[in-house]
Amino acid sequence: MNLNKYIDHTLLKPQATEEDIKKICKEAKEYNFASVCVNTCYTSLVSKELEGTDVTTCVVVGFPLGATTTETKAFEAKQAIEQGAGEVDMVINVGALKSKKYDYVKKDIEAVVEAAKGKALVKVILENCLLEKEEIVKACELSKEAGADFVKTSTGFSTGGAKVEDVKLMRETVGPDMGVKASGAVRTKEDAEAVIAAGANRIGASSSIAIVEGTKSENAGY
């Protein structure tokens, strides 16, 4: 199985330098990954580095807590898209979901979807490790209703990452027409193949090269 185009080559650590970002862009071009996923302050840099390739600039919005206001998320997405982002991974408002404020959660997602319309894909990070199974299902349903393109397991910055059973549940809930992204704790070729078999069609990883080469990863976390 060719895993390269499944992978969003990711660097979200706060201590990442410009040189680190340029390095992952170079790797993404060399290995022809799907995208490079970074914090929004690096959108312009990554877009410039990836110019003329089919590797997309992917950014995270409302990251990692999802607790910024809806207007803030929409602005962050809009600005990043103007700077060249083709994919936006936004974090759901976990507290609002747990408070059963479903209308708020849906509108929060819709605002980012609206900002991205026709210009960028939107992936909704659910942060499954903080959710009960029924909350994962509800979050998937709300994301689909809001018009998002993908649901995503995790930020990689909380208490857990992608689990095969969660990916399976997400795929069953959203059906065949929506993307499912597994991120956090996907560090080996075997991990990647397991989440793909469960229904993922995108993977967020910092261990991307180890995954495609079938070697041992030195990266913990994402």
UniProtKB/Swiss-Prot annotation:
CDD domains: DeoC (cd00959). It is found in: Cytoplasm. It catalyses: 2-deoxy-D-ribose 5-phosphate = D-glyceraldehyde 3-phosphate + acetaldehyde. GO terms for biological process: 2-deoxyribose 1-phosphate catabolic process; carbohydrate catabolic process; deoxyribonucleotide catabolic process. Its EC number is 4.1.2.4. Pathway: Carbohydrate degradation; 2-deoxy-D-ribose 1-phosphate degradation; D-glyceraldehyde 3-phosphate and acetaldehyde from 2-deoxy-alpha-D-ribose 1-phosphate: step 2/2. SUPFAM superfamilies: Aldolase. Keywords: Cytoplasm, Lyase, Schiff base. It is an enzyme of class 4 (lyase). One of its GO terms (cellular component) is cytoplasm. Its main location: cytoplasm. Coiled coil: none annotated. The keyword Cytoplasm applies. The active site is at D89, K152, K181. One of its GO terms (molecular function) is deoxyribose-phosphate aldolase activity. Belongs to the DeoC/FbaB aldolase family. DeoC type 1 subfamily. HAMAP family: DeoC_type1. Catalyzes a reversible aldol reaction between acetaldehyde and D-glyceraldehyde 3-phosphate to generate 2-deoxy-D-ribose 5-phosphate. This is Deoxyribose-phosphate aldolase. The gene is deoC.
